[in-house]
C-alpha cells in the first residue's frame, strides 16, 4: 500500500484500487510521468561510524549540494514538468532548467531525481540555497532572474 501511495500521491486512487482489485491491484500501480512521486531522502547520521552502521559497508557517498531537490518528468511528447520535494510544479519558474533537460537528456519518457543548484556566472561558484529559493516562488521577471541566477542540475543515480 505504501508503494502505491509513493508513486501516485493519491489516497483515493490507492483506496479504490485496494477495494476493487486487492493486493494484486496495488502491486500493479506504477509511476507515470506528470505525477510527482515521493522523493527518497537521505538518512541523517551524526558520525561516519553511525552512517556505516546504518547502511553497511561498502557505501556510496555523494557530495551534498546546497540547492533544491527537483524531479524532471518527460512525458513522451517532449513536455518537461519540474516538481519540488514538496511535489509543487515549478516548471514556469525554471524554463532554463526545463530546456536544459529537454536538450541534454535522451529518452522518450522519463523521471529524473536531481538537485538544482544556483551559481554565480562570473565566478562559477555555487550560491547558497537562500539565493535560489527566490526563484521557486517567483511569478514575474522569470527571464531576468534566470539570467541573473542560472542553475545547473546534478542528477542522482
Question: Locations of the language-model features?
Answer:
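N-terminal nucleic-acid-engaging modules of covalent nucleotidyltransferase systems
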Residues: 1-156
Amino acid at each position: 500500500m505504501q508503494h502505491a501511495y509513493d508513486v501516485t500521491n493519491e489516497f483515493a486512487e490507492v483506496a479504490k484500487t485496494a477495494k476493487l482489485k486487492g493486493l494484486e491491484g496495488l502491486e500493479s500501480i506504477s509511476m507515470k510521468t506528470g505525477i510527482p512521486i515521493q522523493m527518497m531522502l537521505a538518512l541523517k547520521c551524526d558520525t561516519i561510524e553511525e552512517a556505516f552502521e546504518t547502511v553497511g559497508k561498502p557505501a556510496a557517498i555523494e557530495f551534498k549540494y546546497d540547492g533544491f531537490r527537483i524531479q524532471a518528468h518527460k512525458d513522451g511528447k517532449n513536455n518537461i514538468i519540474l516538481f519540488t520535494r514538496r511535489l509543487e510544479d515549478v516548471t514556469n519558474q525554471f524554463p532554463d532548467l526545463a530546456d536544459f533537460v529537454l536538450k541534454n537528456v535522451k529518452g522518450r519518457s522519463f523521471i529524473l531525481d536531481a538537485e538544482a543548484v544556483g551559481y554565480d556566472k562570473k565566478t562559477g561558484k555555487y550560491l547558497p540555497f537562500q539565493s535560489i529559493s527566490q526563484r521557486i516562488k517567483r511569478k514575474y521577471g522569470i527571464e531576468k532572474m534566470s539570467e541573473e541566477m542560472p542553475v545547473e542540475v546534478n542528477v542522482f543515480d
